[in-house]
Amino acid sequence: MGWQKLFVASATVAIASTLVWDSTAQAADLSYSKMYVFGDSLSDSGNIYNSSPQQFPTYYFNGRFSNGPNWVDYLAQDLGLTPTTFITQQSTPLPFPQIPTQSVNFAFGGATTGLDNTITQIAPGLQQQVQAYMGGLLTTNQTADPNALYILWAGANDYLPTESTWFTPPTTANQTINNISFALNSLLNAGAKQIAVANLPSLGQLPLTFGTQDETRLNNLAQAHNLALGQTINSLSQSYNAKIVSLNFASLFADAVNNPGNYNFTNVTQGCLLVQCQNPDQFLFWDFIHPTTEGHKLLAKEAYSALRTSVPEPGEELGLLLLGVLGAASIYKRKKSLDSLALSGKIVSD
């Protein structure tokens, strides 16, 4: 009777699961309570602008380092979130907030993965950004929201040539990866469970560096960085039993450079501003380093796709369930056959 009950119960679950297919599919869509962003100018949605005299060149859009919204803006829109900037108005020194009650973008243009910022010494690097968020948690004795999405993209300013007199770029990726690992450990130890980490494009392919003596060296650094970053992500994911999604922006940039026509680009080596272009949507880069808003759209699409892929499809879950039902049915059938044989005296039970 126990085996019969098991089979009936399993079949009932399978039927019920089929009936709620639509609601299961909806539940599998991306859903985060908040979004916290840490990084540099590629993700900054106005922090450097708001912490400065607010006299950015007019060719930068609303404090972004592009001609329009950046990838964080687009991704937030796709996720139905509206992160505010960490600095909401001109403020010196930087404020130390309480725990945010909404999504917050902590990214600052010029941030390195350490303590330095290559634009101004009063602006934070990645470590201070994470600690600013952590400070709010400590003040209120709370843990990180496990249902929030934490985004981290930094490292380019560690390696690229700089006019900064207080920061010297490293010659290897070791310290940069250690810095990123430290930031990730801080978030994970605080309770973060869903993190997205982006790797670096080939830094020798930027308008700033392409065709210069630094091209090969920077490409090699980016490659070493991405390899070590992938290993770090895998290790931390297992250690903390957390979901750390890798955003492979390196592959996307490489494909855009090698196959520009696939993305409707006609120029992937020069910044639109540098040649006074009339059609920025056909350019991958806006200036020496940063993508156009069209380029940022591609980044947001790639990020959303990576996040979406990390969520199990409803069909996968149902497939596993049905497999379990079939297994139960097989066991039940075998058990029934054995019972029949035992009753006929053809086998002897222990």
Which residues does each predicted region cover?
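C-terminal membrane-anchoring or membrane-association module
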Residues: 329-350
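Compositionally biased, intrinsically disordered low-complexity regions
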Residues: 4, 65, 317, 326-329, ...
